[in-house]
Amino acid sequence: MSLSEARFHDLVDATQQALEDLFDESGMDLDMENSAGVLTVKFEGGAQLIFSRQEPLRQLWLADRSGGFHFDYDEESKKWVCEKSEELLGEMLERIVWERAGEKLDFDEI
C-alpha cells in the first residue's frame, strides 16, 4: 500500500532531521544545508550527499558521486530500502561516509 502524502512528508522530514542530528553529533568537519526539503551534506575534500524527496513516487532520493539511489519506505521494517539493490539507507550511508570521509558512523536508526 502506498504511503499517504502526509505520512510520506512526515517520514522524510524525520529522516532528514535524524541525519542532521547524527552528522551534528559526529564532530566531523562538514557543512549541511536543508532548504526546500533538500538536505545537502558537504564533506571536507568536496564530496557531498544530497537527500531529496520525490513526492509523486513517494521516494527518498540520495545523490552521491557514485550515482543516484531511490529509496522506498518499508512499513514492516520501518526502514528506507533501495529499490534496485534492496540495501537499507543506513547501511549504504555507513559505507559511503566511510569511503568519502574515512569516518565510521552508526546509521542503524535511519
Curated annotation (Swiss-Prot):
User: From its record, what is one biological process in GO terms?
Assistant: iron-sulfur cluster assembly
What cellular component GO annotations does this protein have?
cytosol
PROSITE patterns named in the record: FRATAXIN_1, FRATAXIN_2
A matching Pfam family: Frataxin_Cyay
Q: What InterPro entries is this protein classified in? A: CyaY (IPR047584), Frataxin/CyaY (IPR002908), Frataxin/CyaY_sf (IPR036524), Frataxin_CS (IPR020895)
Q: Which GO terms describe its molecular function?
A: ferric iron binding; ferrous iron binding
Q: What are the UniProt keywords, alphabetically?
A: Iron, Metal-binding
SUPFAM superfamilies listed in its UniProt record? Frataxin/Nqo15-like (SSF55387)
Q: Name the family the entry cites.
A: Belongs to the frataxin family.
Q: Which function does this protein serve?
A: Involved in iron-sulfur (Fe-S) cluster assembly. May act as a regulator of Fe-S biogenesis.
The protein's name: Iron-sulfur cluster assembly protein CyaY
Q: Which organism encodes this protein?
A: Pseudomonas putida (strain GB-1)
